[in-house]
Amino acid sequence: MPELPEVETIKETLKLFVCNKTIKHIDIEWPNMIKHPDDVEEFKALVTGQTIRSMGRKGKFLLFYLDEYVLISHLRMEGKYSVHSPGDPVKKHTHVTFYFSNGEELRYNDVRKFGTMHVYPIGEEFMHKPLNQLGPDPFDTSFNLEYFYEKLKRTDRYIKTALLDQSIVTGLGNIYVDETLFRANVHPLKRCSKLSKQEVKKLQINAKETLRDAIKAGGTTIRSYVNTQGDMGMFQQDLYVYGQHSKPCRVCGADIIKIKVGGRGTHLCPTCQPNKQGVR
């Protein structure tokens, strides 16, 4: 699933191609993707004739700011946007096409068909699902140490599980949680209530640094992620633990191990991230 750095990269590349383009009409081949309004014809009517004025992002969600509305798009597992000229071959699994008045087309392709789209009036986008259920973005000023520490100390969950909770902080997924925990020298099975304020500060700082580094590298391509121009991310070359099972740690040389935390595959260095609680 594209996480914050991948969605940020997609947002920035989309800005180059879709801003100030007017949507002439829309084809929707998989209506189940349209979540609000749930009537596809109403969805089309709201968006048709609107010009894309700017692009935004909240966590893993793309935000298309139109004249009067905001189109909220979640790529889920395999969703991809690409811009095409008229007559370009249409790939299999292209489920939504936005036709611009200049003849260009913005196509949404999704092998798994898990992606979602919502439309709300500008100013109401954070009042409804899905955005109203999200915690702060890691780059929001509201994601400060006091907020983060208060949230974590109130729960006895494993820190790995808490960092994946989008209501605490939004945008982190399995890749960047594992990398953040490694950089902060925190074991994924440590209970949140047992974290010191200094450990929480290290998590906050390293989450931001990890995400910034990944954004600079264009995201991480593990399986199929590419940006709007079809370019792969490069951050997979800089991963310390994720996907590095049995390889030597780049910091200490110990073998990276893989465990399960809350049903999620989790990578760590047992030396750099000691399990001081002895939890299995």
Curated annotation (Swiss-Prot):
Q: Which residues form the signal peptide?
A: none
Zn-finger region bounds: FPG-type:
240-274
Q: Which PROSITE patterns does the UniProt entry name for this protein? A: FPG_CAT, ZF_FPG_1, ZF_FPG_2
Catalytic residues, per the record, are 2-3, 60, 264
The UniProt subunit note reads as follows: Monomer.
- Family under the similarity heading: Belongs to the FPG family.
Q: Which NCBIfam families match?
A: fpg, PRK01103.1
Q: Which PANTHER family match?
A: FORMAMIDOPYRIMIDINE-DNA GLYCOSYLASE (PTHR22993:SF9)
Recorded protein name is Formamidopyrimidine-DNA glycosylase
Q: Which species does the entry assign this protein to?
A: Oceanobacillus iheyensis (strain DSM 14371 / CIP 107618 / JCM 11309 / KCTC 3954 / HTE831)
Gene symbol here is: mutM
